[in-house]
Amino acid sequence: MKMNHHYGELKASYLFVDIAHKVAAYQEAHPEKEIIRLGIGDVTQPLAKCVVTAMQDAAAEMGTKEGFHGYGPEQGYPFLKQAIQGYYASRNTKLDEDEIFISDGAKSDLANVLGLFDVDNTVLVPDPVYPTYVDDNVTDGRKIVYSRTNQENGFLGMPDDSVKADIIYICSPNTPTGAAYTREQLKEWVAYAKKNNAVILYDAAYECFITDEHLARSIFEIEGARECAIEICSFSKIAGFTGTRCGYTIVPKELEREGMNLNKLWLRRQTTKFNGVPYIVQRAAAAVFTESGMAEIQQNLDYYRKNAKVIADALDECGVWYCGGKNSPYIWLRCPGNMKSWEFFDWLLENCGVVGTPGVGFGECGEGYFRLTAFGDAEKTKAAAERIKTAIKAL
């Protein structure tokens, strides 16, 4: 038999393994010192009470003959799709119910949606990049080109007419950099996609952190995007569903390529290869969009926003350049003293007992930069910020 040898082309990822080894060695050498981890990309606040109640009620419902649910609609229950419709409508973005597809998370859909496109397509991804974008396409054998970002452009790549791409990845606010596109910038990307007959895969997993009214929370706020974009979103960051698993993808009915309607194709794909998200989880997700749900999740989001501000304020006081932190849980900073990413990791661990993520782990353009996150404990984040501030000032 023949195997998919493209899996052999995946680059070994030692980033988090190396971090774990370095932290373990430091802890063994300094058992008396407290290590504060600001590299975590997972949420830490518990699910909202109304979400837990909805889950409990749905579980109890499943234990009755009248309330039992077996196989559900592969594209999601109407009650959740309508709740998402309302969420977008509150921001003046109109969606049809049959354009919303419920999934077990953004990561799955980011990979699965590629099945709609031939492998003989060129993919444009940013550098630095969320590694999944690259790996999903390497394993399919697609050609990948990079939009190289830097401090000068605020780590927000813009269209280059000399580059032809068929599939365009945009994540805003971005992981790992925390940078977010304005509506005017997204208009340029939509124009580029339409000019090149390309499709934008818009990762909106962090839209809930946006507070700046000049920033778009959905690509569909941009005129013309319904003809060239698919939006993928998640309950992981807005509601802490990293362990509960639920997300959704929006495929507009206007989106067509080579005479094929992508909304219909995605429906066929899901009904063929996916059995849907559990009823209990979808009831929990729908509770997020209730009045009490939105109030509760805002408390958690504000908790993380305050952590981000604590870190950003410390960097401001030290005169360290960074992006993110204001509409994102990620703070992407220039390593002080012209240190390389791993050099700064070692320095930060040794001098502050603080752990973050070396920027070079996300791509060549991340060298010399470093990621801190706001998902930690508030008191520990304050302590880490003070340690960092003191150490950098002493450089």
Question: Where are the regions that the model predicts?
Answer:
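Conserved glycine-rich beta-strand-loop-beta hairpin in the small C-terminal domain of fold type I
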Residues: Q282, A286, L301-A312, Y322-C335, ...
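PLP-dependent enzyme catalytic core of the Aspartate aminotransferase-like
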Residues: G86, K94, L124, N338, ...
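Conserved core segment of the aminotransferase class I/II
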Residues: I222-D302, K309, D313, K393
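Helix C-cap/helix->beta junction micro-motif
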Residues: H30, D140, K195-N196, C318, ...
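Hydrophobic residues in well-ordered beta-strands that form the structural core
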Residues: V125, Y146, Y202, G356-P358
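Conserved core of the PLP fold type I
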Residues: E66-A193, E207-I222
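N-terminal small-domain helix-loop-helix segment of the aminotransferase-like
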Residues: K2-D104, N112, V288-E291, L395
